[in-house]
Amino acid sequence: DLALTGCGGGKTTSEAQGATTDETTASTEAGSTADGAEAPDLNQDTKGTTITFWHSMGGVNGEAMDYLVNKFNEENTDGITVEAVYQGEYDDTINKLKSAQIGNMGADLVQIYDIGTRFMIDSGWVIPMQELINADGYDISQIEPNIAAYYTVNNELYSMPFNSSTPILYYNKDMFEKAGITEVPTSLEGILAIGDDLKTKGGAGEPLALSIYGWYFEQWLCKQGLSYADNGNGRDAAATAVEFDSNGGALNILNAWKALNDADVAPNVGRAGSDTATTDFTSGKAAITLGSTASLKQILQDVNGSFEVGTAYFPTIKDGDEGGVSIGGASLWALNNNDDAKAAATWKFIKFLISPESQAYWNAETGYFPVTTAADEEQTFKDNVAQYPQFQTAIDQLHDSKPQYAGALLSVFPEARQIVETEIENMINGNETPEKAVESMASQI
């Protein structure tokens, strides 16, 4: 079954979520579980209601967020005011929540990154999005299914997707042309095969600028159609152990990574946080890099026409791999403050944020996917794809994936990602073999 469900699938119960009895009882009394408890009554007078929204969007993305919040505050006729508060990194928001309590959470709506999903489900703090959807009769088919799949457990959507991205391959078309390469490689094997030509004929200082990033490791398991962890990738029940060691997936990834590094096709450029891989690419040193679809605008801006940027699907490990990609980014979680008027106001604001018009604007400004399918029909969206045809790659890759490649849910995902990155680094630095690195990952997570 796991071979079939590959990178996802499954259902959950409050027991499997790992919630303690107290948490489960508390959240049930507060009407905040998806397991048949009383949902909020959305038929409320929201005049004069103020809700607090915590988010982690800085820079250009932060400006786009402020624009949407201000637009809602000016245009909504329900007397609702949204106070948006920038929290810094996603980790900071989760840490701030840890000291909160039901009924007094400090915020009504929070933006939490993908790998915080299991933690939030288990917390007992939330009003599952499905309850608001059901109470309002909202048509959930409007949400892009491959995006919704990540945040869906036991057919319940727990949070509303908002800023979603997948990784893609970026390449320097001029270098490829100079090297006489007409076909863009679709696998790491394929990149290894053209590495020398990119250097000797294409003039690349490094063929592939590859950041050490746990997100890529997770994607390459999905690309092989293999699970990260047991219990249906932590979706049938809380994961108790990793499976990437026993199913061979991790070793395939590390062997391919080491081969690229040994051949000097992908030298060590450090971890993703350093941005070295991106700057190596935009400065014309690297022929290829991997990065988020949400980096497209920044990359094009930094290249500034000095060469033509091409985009392609995120590569597989081997040519025959047939898995898909999983979603990154973040989603919106409604917090339970035992206040139906605030819940109703929060839901109205969420509906505004995911409206086709808002999503087309958000996509054009940030490069994140529109999470609402109808956004594709908005002129803003069409104009943006016409201006940046590279973005079509991201849309096609998303549509070509399947909900079963939604990816794993782990309560310790942030820590697990750090461990994976440390062990890949150890391997690249020659401190351990790929086999030993996989063993170390599995024993620590």
Question: Each predicted region: which residue ranges?
Answer:
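Hinge/lid segment of periplasmic solute-binding proteins
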Residues: A30-D45, Y113-I168, L192, W220-K223, ...
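Short, solvent-exposed loop/beta-turn-alpha elements that line the ligand-binding surface or hinge
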Residues: D41-Q44, Q130-I143, S227-N252, Q301-N304, ...
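Extracytoplasmic "Venus flytrap"/periplasmic binding protein-like
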Residues: K71, E75-I143, D174-T186, D280, ...
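Extracytoplasmic/periplasmic substrate-recognition and gating elements
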Residues: E74-E75, T81, A179, N255, ...
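A structural signal for short loop-to-beta-strand junctions that line the ligand-binding cleft
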Residues: S99-A100, D108, D136-M175, E206-L210, ...
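Periplasmic solute-binding protein
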Residues: I115-W125, Q130, N146-E183, L210-A237, ...
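Glycine-centered hinge/linker elements that transmit conformational signals in sensory
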Residues: G195-D196, A239-G270
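C-terminal capping/gating helix-and-loop segments adjacent to ligand/active sites or protein-protein/ligand interfaces
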Residues: V325-S326, A375-D376, Q390-Q444
